[in-house]
Every structure is written in structure tokens, then in C-alpha cells.
Amino acid sequence: PYDGLSSDRMWSFETGDLDVLRRHIPEAAVVTPVIFNWTDFKHRDCKTQGTVKGVSPDYVAVENPKLSHGRYIQQADLRDCRKVCVLGEKIASQLFPNESNPVGKYIEMQGIYLQVVGISSLTSNVGVGGPASRTVYMPYTTLQRLLGRGDHFDMLALTTRPGHTVSSIQRKIELEIKKLHRIDPSDQQALMSINVESMF
């Protein structure tokens, strides 16, 4: 036990964490939330499976979508919890095999209809939750609501300002998160981090 709390308690990121980390980690250029879930997608008779990823507009700094059609997630989509999405190229070709540009059409996910606003041509296999081509991106606020997640999200993604690396501030970030969630600073199991920089 630490700070009077059970040693096996569950915790998750909350939206309020973002503002605290942005203030306390000035080396970070972007601090952005991510929610992900493996699920089924459908358009008429076409079905496929993949990752749905709830993101904010500044997630482009983490994983550049390289749009071939349409647009990315915008601030108004977050604010209004809009049911819009950006399709990875593989998902788009499976759900719309006879269409080169399905922007404006709708896909079904867990009984909810999402309007396609963009197509990502990013083919990188580096990504949490699966390859970009098999991912559907949508506003994280909308996905929070659809999944009944309240104010919580799965992962924090960040980039650093020029002159800094994620490796150089990783320990500082981890300690800040542990302080926010009353986690023992020496606990190596409570927090998992993936440094994509080190993969290149």
C-alpha cells in the first residue's frame, strides 16, 4: 500500500491530467489523450475489424495521418462530440471496395453511424493499438461517450520541443503522473511507457 491506498487498485488517466502536465512539463510540445478499442466496422454488406482510436486534433504531431482525402479531426468535433471519423486506407478499401473517395459516406460501429470526413494514407506499422491503415480515428470526446468512459482515457501521447527528447524527460513525466494519481514513485508496474523515438 502507498499513501493509504490499496496496492492492487486500478487507475486511469483523466482529462484534468492534461492541463497539469502541460503546465509542469514545459519541454513537451504536445500532450494529447488517446482512447483505443478493437471493434467491428460495417458499411452495407461490407464488414471488417480494426482499432478505433479516439484522438484530438493535435494528435497529428504524434502520428501524421497523411490525408489522401478530406480532413482530420477538428476542435469543433471534440467540442460537439461529433460522430465523424477518419479511415485508415485498408479499412476504407474493405468497407468501400468500389469507391476511391468515401468522404461524406457513413460507416457503422457498435450500432452507431459515423460520417467519414477523411482518409489517411499512412502505412506505418508503428502505432499503439495496431497499424494506421487498420485504424479508424474519431474525436476522443465522442468515443468517451460511446464507451461510457466518462472523463477517462487510455493513454497519453506527447512530443517534445526542439532541443529535447522523450528519453530525456521520460522520468520527469512518469513522476508527475505518479504524483497526480498517488502512485508510489518506486512502483515500476503501475505505469507503462512506449518511446516511439527509440524505434527509429
Which residue ranges define each predicted feature?
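Hydrophobic, regular-secondary-structure patches
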Residues: 1-51, 58-61, 93-94, 144-145, ...
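Mid-to-C-terminal secondary-structure elements
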Residues: 53, 57-77, 81-186
